[in-house]
Amino acid sequence: MSSSFELSVQDLNDLLSDGSGCYSLPSQPCNEVVPRVYVGNASVAQDITQLQKLGITHVLNAAEGRSFMHVNTSASFYEDSGITYLGIKANDTQEFNLSAYFERATDFIDQALAHKNGRVLVHCREGYSRSPTLVIAYLMMRQKMDVKSALSTVRQNREIGPNDGFLAQLCQLNDRLAKEGKVKL
């Protein structure tokens, strides 16, 4: 490691697993991971009544698409409910460059929270890899958290397991923000 702030994917995986190296799957369809920011799965994202009960004003679909591993919703799906929508056509593979969407997702979450009663659901198919990665990036970029703090904050409130490619992208974001003096180490 060339600098004290650089972390490895293994460092982050250690935070995600229990002492035996096991990972837990989400026990709830949706969890509030930080105030007014929820991470959830496809079932809650497609349940307008449940979203309204939660007071969700914005939905960020990190798995937009028609294939099995995606969630086929769009702005028109939410149109009659008054929910603002953003879709990202992300694949849950180690090779997918989700970091290309960190800024756009962060801006959308900011937009939701700028409203007095704004609440945002960030979801993917399972609410386990893509969507928590985007929320972790948001916490790093806007709350000035380092990657371990951001990941731990989300993990305390929801079982998550971003794939190793996404964890590597979060490590790269951490390095960049640290070099720019934009995270608290």
UniProtKB/Swiss-Prot annotation:
Segments forming a coiled coil: none
Active site: 124 (phosphocysteine intermediate)
Catalytic activity annotation: O-phospho-L-tyrosyl-[protein] + H2O = L-tyrosyl-[protein] + phosphate; O-phospho-L-seryl-[protein] + H2O = L-seryl-[protein] + phosphate; O-phospho-L-threonyl-[protein] + H2O = L-threonyl-[protein] + phosphate
GO molecular function: phosphoprotein phosphatase activity; protein kinase binding; protein serine/threonine phosphatase activity; protein tyrosine phosphatase activity; protein tyrosine/serine/threonine phosphatase activity; receptor signaling protein tyrosine kinase inhibitor activity
Heme keyword on record: no
GO biological-process terms attached to the record: cellular response to epidermal growth factor stimulus; flagellated sperm motility; negative regulation of epidermal growth factor receptor signaling pathway; regulation of focal adhesion assembly
Cellular component, GO annotation: axonemal microtubule doublet inner sheath; nucleus; sperm flagellum
Keywords tagged on the record: Cell projection, Cilium, Cytoplasm, Cytoskeleton, Flagellum, Hydrolase, Nucleus, Protein phosphatase
Database matches in InterPro entries: Atypical_DUSP_subfamA (IPR020405), Dual-sp_phosphatase_cat-dom (IPR000340), Prot-tyrosine_phosphatase-like (IPR029021), Tyr_Pase_AS (IPR016130), Tyr_Pase_dom (IPR000387), TYR_PHOSPHATASE_DUAL_dom (IPR020422)
Cell location: Nucleus; Cytoplasm, Cytoskeleton, Flagellum axoneme
Enzyme class: hydrolase
Domain Tyrosine-protein phosphatase: 28-179
Enzyme Commission number: 3.1.3.16, 3.1.3.48
Source organism, top-level taxon: Eukaryota
Keyword Ribosomal protein part of the UniProt annotation: no
Similarity remark: Belongs to the protein-tyrosine phosphatase family. Non-receptor class dual specificity subfamily.
Alphabetized PANTHER family for the sequence: AGAP008228-PA (PTHR45682), DUAL SPECIFICITY PROTEIN PHOSPHATASE 3 (PTHR45682:SF1)
Job description of the protein: Shows activity both for tyrosine-protein phosphate and serine-protein phosphate, but displays a strong preference toward phosphotyrosines. Specifically dephosphorylates and inactivates ERK1 and ERK2.
Self-association state and partner proteins as the record states: Microtubule inner protein component of sperm flagellar doublet microtubules. Interacts with VRK3; this interaction activates DUSP3 phosphatase activity.
Protein name per the record: Dual specificity protein phosphatase 3
Organism: Mus musculus
